[in-house]
Structures are given as C-alpha cells and as structure tokens.
Amino acid sequence: MSAKAYYHLPGLFEFCEFYRAFLPLYRANRDWFYDWCEIGSIYGAPADCLWGGGRAGFGECGAREALALAQEYGVSARLTFSNSLLREEHLSDRKCNALCELFSQANGVQNGVIVHSELLTNYLRTRYPALYLVSSTTKVLTDFEDFRRELDREEFRYVVPDFRLNKRFEELNALSQVHKDKVEFLCNECCWFGCNDRKRCYEVVSRKNLGEDCEHRCKAPDAQSGYRFSKAMENPGFIGVDAVLRTYLPMGFSQFKIEGRGLGSALILEFLLYYMTKPAYQLRVREEIYLDNMLDLF
C-alpha cells in the first residue's frame, strides 16, 4: 500500500494568481487538508509555446515568477510540452529552450516536462538531463500492452495512460511495484468514454500551437455543454476521492493528475476542495480565497 497520494495540479502559468492565494493557505492550515495527500507538482505552459500540447496555452504569468512560486512552496514545476507533431526545425525554438534552461537550473525540488514527441523526448534527455520526463496522456494509450511497454521505458519517471484504462483493475494490480510507482492516473476527465476521436483532438491543438489554422468539432454527446465536474463524476473512468484512498492507494498507486488548464480558476478550487480538503473546512477555504459577506452572484 502507498502511504500518500500525490496530486499533479493544472495551471502553473494559467492560474499563477490562484496558487499565490492557495499555497500559503495550504501551508498555514495543513490540518484543513487530508494528511494522506500532498501536491506532487503543478504543470502548465505559457501562451504561444511552440512545443505546447494538450490544451492551447493561455498562461500569462512570467516564467521566473511561476517557478519562484513553486520553489517557495517546495512543489515540482512541470512544463507541458506535449506537442505531438514537432519537426527537427522546431527543436531550436528559443522560447521553449529558455524555459527548459531556466527550469533545469532551479534549486531544490526537481522539475520536469510532460512530453509526447519522440523527437523532443530524445532532445530533452540529451540537452536538459536535469529535468525528469512524463509520458503524456495525449498519446492516448488505450491498449494495456502498449501502456505496459511505455512503463518499461526508463526515460520516463511517470506515464499517464488514457483515462479509459483507469478501471482495468486486474491488469493494473498485476503490475510490478516499480511500474505502479510510475503510473499517473488522470482522475477527472470529462471526455466521452466512447470517443474514437481523442487523438485527433489533441493533434488539432498541436497544429494550432504550430501556428496552423485548423478546426475540430467534438462529436461527443452533450459536447456543447463543455466541461462540467458533475458530468466528469459520472464518467466510467472517473477516479473520486474515496477511490483514491480506498482502492488505488491500497493497490500501491500514488500518482494522480487533475486536469483543468483550459477551465476557470473557480473550478480548479472546486477540484482542490473535493480531492484534498476535509469537508468540515471546505467552506473556510472558500471564505479565505474569495467568499465574503458582500459577494453577489447576480
């Protein structure tokens, strides 16, 4: 059984101001939060990053500012560089290389990169060996044997499978502890469980980050409603807080990713309340972050 769950949180650049409010609260009032979980990392990418993927980045926070905040609270900072369509000429991008250089020279906790492209994986291993690598969920690893082979790869510290493997308990439990330690489950995906277009959706984001003009219309039922946490909770691949504590930790798994870079900070707070905060203190966290006696909704 794993002793602790480590959550990997969205929005290093996108929600820098939110974390500037939340992290001091988390440190000063640790008893408000479950003692069986910690923040494993915060991930994201600035706007207009050529190597970006997964979501089109919109983070406006400065790189040094975002990194300094993570370092102040002893949290690993991850760059989301999961563009799947990179070519050799893209490796010389000055902005992305400068970010890797900055993050690789950081003191204290080690920082990492979430990556898809094999070309970029090899480049980062050679050029920035101080950064650990995470195999991105944008690879859409839905075949368990493909996932197992990805876990075998020594270049990756963690591997994020497609959310549709989350409940394959017999095969998951049969993994060695070395492999279990590398699995990072995506907990709160809202994507239609039967989607056959997921990889193409991610490729469209990669093309947009490369400056290409392309459109993609989601074909999932209820796609027009967008992300709703209540809908994600009904997804067959959803991993709830009780499942983390009573199923996955006892099985020996410890790494859990929360998605949400393209959402609003109010929803990010709801994720952290649900996954990390004791029910008796959830209202107090809201009051400390935004809720006062003069706040009007309408």
Name what the model sees in each region:
Residues 1-150, 156-298:
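Active-site pocket-lining/capping segments in soluble small-molecule metabolic enzymes
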